[in-house]
């Protein structure tokens, strides 16, 4: 299938490489011409993914119009750019094209809503949105380290299309979920627990304290998630 990946940061490049590995026709977009020129010339991003070579088969462009012909559009832009990028996409992609957001967090510019809500609002609700989220590091995905992730959406068809695009039999397992609220909130709230776990380490409190903090933190995430509509 044709996949258009918006964003050439570490995560965007890693996912573009995975999709290319899976046999898809992949285009990566950046809004910076100098970055586009550098990636064309060097075929790598030494700052974010040192030693990782971007395959020649991945097209790199500053022209977003190619998204109009894509079966799947992947949003891998910084969180502050999600809304503005989705607004541009709304003028380009046809209705029903699946939009996959791979960022985590909440949209502080729009009342701390979930990013799937931000995208859906920007695109007038005409496109199914998938949250692709999980315990993942870009550099490990780029190097083919075994990884598991979840594609969550209110649209089962959109989640399964995303699963089919990203999953392979060697190193990338994709599960599907209808609980997009829970998946997005979990991806955002876990950062708070991660900070607390780091503080525990810094204070030298040991494994017992950190384990207790993480366990109770997971319980709080689940309780708060349910209050906010998660399953």
Predicted regions and their residues:
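Internal alpha-helical scaffold of NAD(P)-dependent oxidoreductase catalytic cores
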Residues: 81, 92, 122-128, 146-231
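Short, conserved active-site loop motifs that form the nucleotide-linked donor/cofactor pocket
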Residues: 57-59, 172
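Rossmann-like NAD(P)(H) cofactor-binding subdomain of soluble oxidoreductases
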Residues: 54, 65-146, 162-164
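Hydrophobic/aromatic beta-strand patches that form the interior of the parallel beta-sheet core
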Residues: 27-29, 61, 74, 100, ...
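NAD(P)+-binding Rossmann beta1-loop-alpha1 motif at the extreme N-terminus of oxidoreductases
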Residues: 1-52, 61-62, 113
């Amino acid at each position: 299938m044709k996949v258009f990946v918006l964003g050439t940061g570490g995560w965007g490049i890693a996912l573009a490489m995975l999709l290319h590995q899976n046999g898809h026709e992949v285009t990566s977009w950046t809004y910076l011409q100098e970055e586009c020129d550098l990636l064309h010339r060097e075929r790598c991003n030494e700052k974010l993914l040192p030693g990782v070579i971007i395959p020649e088969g991945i097209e790199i462009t500053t022209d977003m119009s190619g998204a109009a012909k894509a079966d799947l559009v992947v949003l891998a832009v910084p969180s502050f750019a999600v809304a503005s990028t989705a607004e541009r996409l709304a003028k380009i992609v046809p209705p029903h094209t699946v939009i996959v957001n791979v960022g985590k967090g909440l949209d502080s510019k729009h009342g701390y809503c979930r990013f799937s809500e931000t995208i859906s609002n920007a695109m007038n609700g005409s496109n199914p949105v998938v949250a692709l989220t999980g315990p993942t590091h870009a550099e490990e995905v780029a190097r083919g380290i075994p990884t598991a992730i979840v594609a969550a959406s209110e649209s089962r068809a959109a989640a399964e299309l995303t699963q089919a695009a990203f999953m392979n039999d060697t190193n990338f397992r994709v599960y599907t979920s209808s609980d997009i609220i829970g998946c997005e909130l979990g991806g955002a709230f876990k950062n708070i627990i991660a900070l607390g776990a780091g503080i525990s380490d810094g204070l030298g409190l040991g494994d017992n304290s950190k384990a207790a903090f993480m366990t109770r933190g997971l319980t709080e995430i689940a309780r708060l998630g349910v209050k906010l509509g998660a399953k």
